[in-house]
A protein has these predicted regions:
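Aromatic-lined carbohydrate-binding surfaces of glycoside hydrolases
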Residues: 1-194
């Protein structure tokens, strides 16, 4: 709405740019629900590094929630990259990111088992702040899918890296892992309402 219907206009010397002053009245309106899936690569490890906190410590969870809230409530992002394993993205070949892994992996006597509690906490934060969808971290390295992502596990009582750049993506060992992991992940996500 312009007072008295008058537009105040001051053009520059060439007449190419101008400023105008007016009063804008914003009515009460609500946009329809967003239907576009808007995902972003959300690097939880970078937040831990930047703020100097231990990955998945309570302070890190507080920081994550602040950024998830901003993404979902302020920026219309309704899907986030979810680090079930440390995402093998934006690294040099043979490089590693700081470990941020939401799925606990165990291998005892060659048998895999998985814990999804941290993934459930992440999903709860996302849903609470309008992020309805999860983009699961890539299961292969970014540069040609030649290798496996870094995956940490407790193997016979000792935590260690079981996959990474040194393990080919097409290896029988990784295939056996995926055959155990993917059905368990699907069941866990369905249990969380996905």
């Amino acid at each position: 709405r312009m007072p008295n219907g008058v537009l105040y206009r001051d053009a520059d010397a060439a007449g190419l740019a101008f400023t105008c002053r007016f009063t804008l009245c914003v009515g009460r309106a609500r946009l329809p629900a967003q239907t576009l899936l808007h995902t972003e690569w959300f690097h939880a490890d970078c937040l831990a590094s930047y703020y100097g906190v231990a990955p998945l410590s309570e302070e890190h969870w507080r920081i994550l929630e602040n950024f998830i809230r901003a993404a979902g409530e302020e920026h219309g992002i309704n899907m986030l990259l979810t680090p079930v394993f440390t995402p093998p993205l934006d690294t040099a070949v043979n490089g590693e990111r700081l470990t941020v892994q939401l799925v606990d992996v165990r291998r005892d006597a060659g048998v895999y088992s998985f814990g999804f509690e941290k993934l459930g906490r992440w999903a709860g934060l996302c849903r609470r702040h309008g992020v309805e969808y999860l983009e699961i971290a890539h299961l292969f390295t970014q540069w040609g899918a030649h290798a496996t992502p870094k995956i940490m596990a407790v193997v016979d009582g000792q935590e260690r890296r079981i996959f990474g750049w040194d393990v080919p993506a097409a290896s029988a060992e990784y295939r056996a892992f995926l055959e155990a992991f993917l059905p368990a992940l699907r069941t866990a996500l369905e249990g969380m309402g996905y």
